[in-house]
């Protein structure tokens, strides 16, 4: 892998660990999710907060600032000077999380001069990890137990390069849109 390999590994581990924290709350029959409302009236749960804390801590070992959906608001004047930054949505699909329909993800991207150079999407309910890095390609790793921390060698050995051929069994399209409308799958 290229020089982003270490950052990719950090992001993968952070996403999986955040996914575990999310699932611990999601599967707790006693949990009310601690739902609050943000300034824009969108929901915020304790799972959002916990996942954000885990990811922010993991990414703090890198030299890049973190811009998170659930983090503190950072003025554009400050952000505009950043050449590289992490963009994070620790629980993308909070409304779906609350509905308990399983359609939510953990999203982490490293962006250089406005262009993503690596990204990680973890689907904790399905235990599926998608990741990509500039000059490396895109990959899928299935059956990652929430909280399990695979080595980079294990990730390389088990990951499947995307896109896969149409003949590959077990491919699932998780969502599709046409003209801004989500299509049923």
Where are these regions (language model features)?
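N-terminal subdomain of lithium-sensitive/metallo-dependent phosphomonoesterases centered on the IMPase/IPPase/PAP
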Residues: 1-91
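Acidic beta-strand-loop-alpha-helix segment within the catalytic core
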Residues: 108-185
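Residue-level signal for inorganic ion chemistry
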Residues: 22, 48, 59, 94, ...
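Short glycine/proline-enriched turns and hinge-like loops at secondary-structure junctions
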Residues: 78-80, 98-102, 132
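Conserved beta-strand segments that form the floor/walls of ligand-binding pockets within enzyme
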Residues: 67, 87, 105, 131, ...
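Glycine-rich active-site/cofactor-binding loop and its immediate structural neighborhood
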Residues: 84-121
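Residues that scaffold the ATP/ADP-binding catalytic core of kinase and kinase-like folds
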Residues: 25, 96, 141
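Flexible, active-site-adjacent loop/turn segments at secondary-structure boundaries
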Residues: 33, 42, 95-96, 102, ...
